[in-house]
């Protein structure tokens, strides 16, 4: 399989910014308590007019505009999310319908119901071989709609947002690691779970899982080049600052190479890596030809890791 070339990014954040001090008025917590344990200071929550779908559409449109491509140039679109506003039509379908050129667009579209942006890339392996053109990958979340605002263990962690990335196949090395723990589950409320928290999480177990998976180097043709010590920057799932710090120390890597933005956005699940990539691109921190080591160790028991170039 060829490597991937990142050609453009886009991002979108909700209009409402929620500070730790604001949360301290809702639950028994404080800015110092949250920041010291997670590194999070603020996060964005959707307003009544916003959703994971509207954010995804905005991020995808921005990526398209920056790439100079038209919707008809996109041969495949995949969206990763666990907080889509509707079971059907999918968020990916909604993105296609809202593009400027509505009668043309991806020949194949899907929404992956998972909180890991990185696992959405290899999931499309058959598409890469069938349509050797341009792919759009989106990660979007509106986790504020799934949280119990009275549950301190979750409401302080999660935020909303969306990021989009456009990739091409390229003759560059690649490295890939995928994994899942089918015996572990993240419980989310449904119609038959009245009175239960929409999202519940064993924070200590998630921490252990994230630390374990983040320390495993990618496997593939570019394994050596993909190691974090040899990459220009590592883009990890932005769940908790302490998780990244712990892994950087264990890997004996340079902390300056690992990008963090959870202090401003919290844990946006599937959106965290594409939002981070978009910020790096906007700041001019993705020089052409650089190797990237994006890692997703999500709150749910699946993970993916992919090395690519820009």
Report residues per predicted region:
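Flexible, glycine-rich active-site loops centered on histidine and acidic residues
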Residues: 125, 129-159
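Phosphate/pyrophosphate-binding loops at sites that engage ATP/ADP/AMP, CoA/4′-phosphopantetheine
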Residues: 59-75, 216-232, 280-285
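Buried hydrophobic positions in well-ordered alpha/beta secondary-structure cores of metabolic enzymes
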Residues: 6-8, 34, 63, 77, ...
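Condensing-enzyme catalytic core mediating Claisen C-C bond formation in acyl metabolism
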Residues: 1-48, 151-208, 212, 216, ...
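Glycine/charged-rich beta-loop-alpha catalytic/anionic-binding loops adjacent to active sites
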Residues: 40-42, 73-78, 97-111, 144-150, ...
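Short beta-strand segments
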Residues: 7, 80, 111, 135-141, ...
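A structural motif shared across PLP-dependent enzymes of the aminotransferase-like
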Residues: 22-24, 29, 54, 83-93, ...
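Claisen-condensing/thiolase-fold acyl-transfer catalytic domains that form or cleave C-C bonds
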Residues: 53, 57-60, 64, 83-84, ...
């Amino acid at each position: 399989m060829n490597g991937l070339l990142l050609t453009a990014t886009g991002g979108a954040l909700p209009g409402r910014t929620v500070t730790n001090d604001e949360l301290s008025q809702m639950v028994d917590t404080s800015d110092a308590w949250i920041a010291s344990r997670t590194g999070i200071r603020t996060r964005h929550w959707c307003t009544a007019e916003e959703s994971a779908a509207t954010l995804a559409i905005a991020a995808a449109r921005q990526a398209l505009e920056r790439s100079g491509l038209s919707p008809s140039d996109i041969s495949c679109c995949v969206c990763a999310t666990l907080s889509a506003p509707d079971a059907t039509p999918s968020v990916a379908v909604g993105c296609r319908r809202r593009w400027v050129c509505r009668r043309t667009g991806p020949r194949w579209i899907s929404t992956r119901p998972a909180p890991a942006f990185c696992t959405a890339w290899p999931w499309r392996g058959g598409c890469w071989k069938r349509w050797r053109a341009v792919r759009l990958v989106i990660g979007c979340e509106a986790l504020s709609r799934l949280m119990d605002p009275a549950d301190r263990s979750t409401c302080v962690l999660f935020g909303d947002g969306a990021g989009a990335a456009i990739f091409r196949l390229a003759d560059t090395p690649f490295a890939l690691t995928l994994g899942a723990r089918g015996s572990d589950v993240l419980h989310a409320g449904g119609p038959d779970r009245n009175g239960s928290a929409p999202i519940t999480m064993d924070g200590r177990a998630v921490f252990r899982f994230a630390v374990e998976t983040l320390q495993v180097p990618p496997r593939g043709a570019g394994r050596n080049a993909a190691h974090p010590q040899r990459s220009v920057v590592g883009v990890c799932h932005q769940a908790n600052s302490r998780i990244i710090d712990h892994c950087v120390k264990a890997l004996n890597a340079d902390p300056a190479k690992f990008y963090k933005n959870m202090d401003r956005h919290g844990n946006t699940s599937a959106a965290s890596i594409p939002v981070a990539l978009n910020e790096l691109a906007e700041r001019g921190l993705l020089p052409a030809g650089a190797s990237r080591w994006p890692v997703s160790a999500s709150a749910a028991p699946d993970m993916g890791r992919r090395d690519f170039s820009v």
